[in-house]
Amino acid sequence: MRLSSLGEATAGSAAPAVVCGSRTDLYIACSCTEGQCSRADSMALNERGMQMDRGQARPAVRQPDERERKQRLVNRCFRESRVPDSESSPGTERRTAELSGFYTTKKLRSLYWTLRTDASLTAFAVAQERDTILISNRHHSEENLKLYQYDNVKSKLRRIQTITLPGGSVVACALPGPGFNVVMGEALRRTHDQLILTGHEDAVVNLIATSLEEGDARIIRRFNPAKYLRRLRAQYGDEAADMPWLQEIDSLRVRQLTPWRSVKTDATGFIALVNELIFIYTFDDTREPLYMHHFPGVESFDVNPENELLLALSGSKYGANGISLLDLTKMRGIGRQYAPAGHLKAFERAADSKHCLWLDKSLLVNSVGNILRVWDIRCSTGLKCEVLGHKSNITAVRYHKNSHTLYSCDEDGYIFSWELSHLLRELEGMTDVRRMTLCRSPQSIKTADDCSTTIQCGNIVVAPDTEFSSKRNSSVRSSSSRLGRLHLQFLGDGTLITLDALELGVHKVQDAKCYIAPSKNKLRRHSELPIKTLAPSAVSHAVESDSSLSSDSTLVERAQLEELHHDIFGSGFMSLDLHAEVDHS
């Protein structure tokens, strides 16, 4: 029998109907057989309701008002929330959303894979165009390059190929983008689509061409800075004795590799930091570098994103701030080197800066101990503000341009993210910003003057899990010194990739629903939205008890973790046993 409205049967109805109601005078009509109700969650018969004989006129049923309809919807959602997930009705999620039982926020999803303890990691690089990850490790006497591709949809790593290299150990590597493939020639480009740069302990740099699907890797160029320096030493003759950097040829080592391309000449090549020497090679000439000079105390460099002839240098011989600029416009001699006014002369107060990084064409950042300093090369003073929050020396710095987010990590294993969009807007307004701190930190705003000079924009991305690390023996932890520091890289969509001697991590910020738990008061449960309570949060273990260095995490379901529990790295890696996915608030 079909009901057209509450309590009114359509014409031609033959079966008797039962009017079901609650003691709150809410009436619900259903097509039940006489004497029983087929609804599992039906309410008791209204004390005033009577079973109607066939053909007997029904009493008029009062239509519920807006308040009663809303109350009925709440009660129905509450009853359905106690039904198992497999038996809940499809409309439950829609009605839950209508009642605002959750709110959407941003959370960090982290995946980890444990690395094999008998393989020494030596280098790490990422190609953002194809989400390709390159890891170099040394297993016994073999030097292997392993290429992986990350699937963001399935959250899995697929191993593409393994390349075994001759010669010394790989200590630096890079993955040039598709724009550099012109060096392979037309014939080779038909079968090969990826270039790999590798720097070795004996200062040799190899350019490798490979196919991501078919393999067939081959070395197409080999650069030997040591051989060039030997020829240079022979040319100088007796004068070479006054050049200490020419006496260190036998101990040369590649420390940093960066693909390089000239906009004016369209030449492609790379910049290499070999000991304290900076080399610029083009792929067309393997014998003579385009540029070479010795910079005492240099630790790292970075190329300006809009001017390939402007380099930032950081080191221990650049005064109190450890930062310098190198202009190679003329490509003759040393070029022009700049530093903040008078700072190059202050060697007695020289700072040891390990990292430098361009944020855009005019802003750059460098690290000095546990402090990050932001510089504006358009200003005479240069220094704009300091980034405070780390309690140990900073070991790596990376910047994601699209999201205006700066990432930094320290020796304790903390990774912080700094939202620089606030700073960029403040700089455009030429306000007096002096400090950037964590959102919750003892170094936050303390006085009224701090409101105009301090920006709170830092968040904890990853905190060290001391309980997990303590399970590893001391010999494993000591092997982390082989890698030197925690490496940070990005995929094309901004997903953060971290690598140290123990594990590979993939971290991505995504939207997450946070459900509102119902009240524990039984007398109020019928009037509140009943939503299934989530499992208790798991708190990541921090090194210190400082509240600013602790973060909440939510573990995912066991079924999702079991899908990740497999050997994904082959002979070089093994899967992590259940701390695989963690959401950091």
UniProtKB/Swiss-Prot annotation:
<keyword id="KW-0677">Repeat</keyword>
<dbReference type="GO" id="GO:0030864">
    <property type="term" value="C:cortical actin cytoskeleton"/>
</dbReference>
<keyword id="KW-0961">Cell wall biogenesis/degradation</keyword>
<dbReference type="Pfam" id="PF00400">
    <property type="entry name" value="WD40"/>
</dbReference>
<feature type="repeat" description="WD 3">
    <location>
        <begin position="389"/>
        <end position="428"/>
    </location>
</feature>
<feature type="repeat" description="WD 1">
    <location>
        <begin position="179"/>
        <end position="218"/>
    </location>
</feature>
<dbReference type="InterPro" id="IPR015943">
    <property type="entry name" value="WD40/YVTN_repeat-like_dom_sf"/>
</dbReference>
<protein>
    <recommendedName>
        <fullName>Protein DSE1</fullName>
    </recommendedName>
</protein>
<dbReference type="InterPro" id="IPR019775">
    <property type="entry name" value="WD40_repeat_CS"/>
</dbReference>
<dbReference type="GO" id="GO:0051015">
    <property type="term" value="F:actin filament binding"/>
</dbReference>
<dbReference type="InterPro" id="IPR036322">
    <property type="entry name" value="WD40_repeat_dom_sf"/>
</dbReference>
<keyword id="KW-0132">Cell division</keyword>
<keyword id="KW-0853">WD repeat</keyword>
<dbReference type="GO" id="GO:0030042">
    <property type="term" value="P:actin filament depolymerization"/>
</dbReference>
<dbReference type="GO" id="GO:0071555">
    <property type="term" value="P:cell wall organization"/>
</dbReference>
<dbReference type="InterPro" id="IPR001680">
    <property type="entry name" value="WD40_rpt"/>
</dbReference>
<feature type="repeat" description="WD 2">
    <location>
        <begin position="346"/>
        <end position="385"/>
    </location>
</feature>
<comment type="similarity">
    <text>Belongs to the WD repeat DSE1 family.</text>
</comment>
<feature type="region of interest" description="Disordered">
    <location>
        <begin position="50"/>
        <end position="71"/>
    </location>
</feature>
<dbReference type="GO" id="GO:0051301">
    <property type="term" value="P:cell division"/>
</dbReference>
<keyword id="KW-0131">Cell cycle</keyword>
<comment type="function">
    <text>Involved in cell wall metabolism and required for the separation of the mother and daughter cells.</text>
</comment>
